[in-house]
Amino acid sequence: MQKFLIWENNMTQIDSFREEVKQWLDDNCPASMRAGADPETPLDEVWGGRKAVYKNPESKVWLDRMGAKGWTMPTVPSEYGGGGLSKEEVKVLNEEMFAIGAKTPLLSFGIWMLAPVLLEYGSEEQKKEHLPKIIKGEIRWCQGYSEPGSGSDLASLATKAEDIGEHFMVNGQKVWTSYADKADWIFALVRTGPKEPKHDGISFLLIDMETNGVSTKPITLISGKSPFCETFFDDVKVPKSNLIGQLNAGWAIAKALLQHERAFISNFGLAAAVGSKKDLVTIAKKHIGEENGKINNGFYRSEIASHKIKEHAFGLTLQRAGDEGGKASATASMFKLYGTEHNKKRHELMIAAMGTDGVAWDGDEFDDSDKNLTKAWLRTKGNSLEGGTSEVQLNVISKRVLGLPS
């Protein structure tokens, strides 16, 4: 009887919270940030930060309101600017946002990668300094991991940070730094123990991109876009207070962050598939043709059905893992591997359905949407490299999940 009363009380609290969320969203989510918005309204990919430019002013309004509520990171304790919500409350929040088609208010490496390790490894002062700015989208972060010659063998990195009293002097180069030219700060791995074994001489450092000696150079990809950069550090002075964790103990933090990165990549790919206008069925009907609402190709119908079934199963698996909670683990490598290959397969199916339009690049004879799909397909080739290659994920799975020998 007592268990039933506790359950009934919890349900009453959740129901009450749901009504609160519905009312708040109704009052605070701008019309253009919901499903059914005017298709002519400019869309923003909101990353926040000091350099942010908004085509639609309501994108900034939505970010500010969600950030002030702490709902861009709803599980983070309120003393750090988060929402302080329980898992059950977060589930309700997500359901109600989905119900009105609310747009994600903020895309952020700070949220997806840095904040979780700050909560685990950061000092109280570091949490209070950086977490509220991450949650409100005031500061945009980038990741300084890979270097020329240090990709999959990340621990061989050479960027060094020398002790010069109250500061570290940082010299070196990072590469494939996503949006470094647009970021305000970078979280970077640096070598502070040159005489230590390579895994033991690494530290985790936060660096303001406005510091003298920091420079970036965008890298043009096969898609024609330049989301990645080379990042250079030339005699960059960084306060020692920006060291996260202990000196020479950054490798454990680096690995923990990678698990969070892999988890977000797998979730991001699935969200893109579910919420994308580049739907497989729509594209197939456009390019292959349809009859009585069915795609005019039995084999392709079967391929899409199989892909959609796997997509749904993957989504349920991610949801179950999220509901179970716990720290990011090696299972993130399983999700990253599957999510990567699933996203690549989705684009391969779209390109196959498009026929010769699938190689659209320039020229008035091609639709802009077709040209964008071709470039998006090319971009997916990097999915199996970023965040750790698929081969690295297989190694992690074999050792840490299956317990196989090295």
Segments the model singles out, each with a brief description of its role:
Residues 2-108, 129-136, 300, 337, ...:
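Amphipathic, small/basic residue-rich leader segments at the start of a protein or domain
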Residues 37, 289-295, 301, 312-365:
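C-terminal helix-coil-helix/basic helical segment that borders enzyme active sites and/or dimer interfaces
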Residues 88, 92, 113, 253-262, ...:
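Glycine-rich phosphate/cofactor-binding loops in nucleotide/flavin-utilizing enzymes
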Residues 106-125, 151, 167:
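N-terminal glycine-rich flavin-associated loop
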Residues 137-145, 189:
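A short, Trp-centered hydrophobic/proline-enriched beta-strand micro-motif
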Residues 158, 167, 171-217:
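A short core secondary-structure module
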Residues 175-180, 222-223, 382-387:
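Glycine-rich phosphate/pyrophosphate-binding beta-alpha loops
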Residues 214-315, 383, 399:
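Glycine-rich beta->alpha junctions and the first turn(s) of the following alpha-helix
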